[in-house]
Amino acid sequence: MTKNNETGWNLDNSYTTLPQSFYTEIPPTPVSSPELVKLNHSLAISLGLTPEELKKEAEIAIFAGNGLPEGAHPLAQAYAGHQFGHFNMLGDGRALLIGEQITPSGERFDIQLKGSGPTPYSRRGDGRAALGPMLREYIISEAMYALDIPTTRSLAVVTTGEPTYRETKLPGAILTRVASSHIRVGTFQYAAARGSIEDLKSLADYTIKRHYPEIESHENRYTALLQEVIKRQASLIAKWQLAGFIHGVMNTDNITISGETIDYGPCAFMDNYDQGTVFSSIDTQGRYAYGNQPYMAAWDLARLAESLIPILHEDEEEALKIAQDEISKFSVQYEKQWFLGMKKKLGLFSNEEQDHSLIEQLLKMMEKYKADYTNTFRSLTLDAIENTALFESPEFKEWYKLWQSRLDRQEQSKENAYEMMKNNNPSIIPRNHRVEEALEAAVTNDDYSVMEKLLEALSNPYAYSTDQEEYCAPPAPTNRPYRTFCGT
């Protein structure tokens, strides 16, 4: 572990303690004229880095892959994955882990360059990334962080001075991604597919030490690992659903063992409440639609359980039973987390038998009247019932009376209930049309002011500030249906 005291780099490379089949050591491919277009000051400071130093030419070179900080050990990680249900051997096709930053508080975070050039896993790709998708990941990941949804984060975006060629010629860019780790369900699938139980154990032991040290001495630690990952994913997916977030590409290589959201390619936030909402242009069957996300998470976790079967128990039948028993607990844990979150969104402290019905009635009405998901809860929080089809309907007025009498029966005051709602119903989300406006200004006009203003508003989604109101409006009909593309 080497520390550069001026900038604060303090890199370790624990991933290289795994068998070499899990990665390939390879340097990033240099670019012609890197330019820093976005730096995350607050994240840099939390990592123990000095923002002013990071703006210097030598540090910008690091973000571009033209140089490496002391202690860096660049490598591309190998993994597999079910992509829309089809199994493939994969790997970092355009990203490199340059090291693990140890923060002043002793936490460990992967520092990864995304768009850093081809690797042995590129599968004929150029290993590069376009500016628009990299800025998009920056905006959405930082919005998720502000919403208190576990996520990878974005430290910096640099332009490369070189074009990337997709459907058209686009400006190239590299994103510096920060994650608790990049270990995925697909990493375990990769280990299992190769057939080495020793390699599988090495990966499981490393993962436990890194993410779940509290279970290291557990009698059945590999079962405990599966339990912990299920618990974190149940919590994560509940938070997605509560915020109206649609990931769009829940392949097993995009499900982290740490429980963080990763890969912001075709993701988007729901406008009108609709269980069938799909934004991704490639998800033609709606596999990863909003309402399917909990089921797909369970499916992905079942693939993790399958991968762990050789080390769950020496008897295969017993191992299979353990795997099935643990996976069956996901839906119970998810439902519990989602229900608790929904109660908070409606200001319900106590438990009453009809609470489930109260929540379901509201959601059914929202779907029937195509009500905006975020703004409906925002209006309820402000007790500002606007002139919309939902709020004007007789069934909503009846529901509203039931809800108000439910609030009246609580020991806590209505003021406390509305305060809890305010802390759980964001006033602002990264609306798809607003994100596109920011990207258009930055990529086409080299104007980052629109993005900066949007990021500032998104940084405090529960503020209910008048400054944010312009970002609360849903898109005009001309901006629908919104389609996303897997540009990251």
Swiss-Prot record:
Reply yes or no: does the keyword Transferase apply: yes
Keyword line: ATP-binding, Magnesium, Manganese, Metal-binding, Nucleotide-binding, Nucleotidyltransferase, Transferase
Per the UniProt entry, the Enzyme Commission number(s) are 2.7.7.-, 2.7.7.108
Name any cofactors this protein relies on: Mg(2+); Mn(2+)
Residues reported in the UniProt entry to bind ATP: 91, 93-94, 114, 126-127, 177, 184, 263
Q: Could you tell me which InterPro entries the record lists for this protein?
A: SelO (IPR003846)
Any S-S bridges, and between which cysteines? none
Residues holding Mg(2+): 254, 263
User: What's a Pfam family this protein contains?
Assistant: SelO
Domain of life (superkingdom): Bacteria
| Name used for this protein in its record | Protein nucleotidyltransferase YdiU
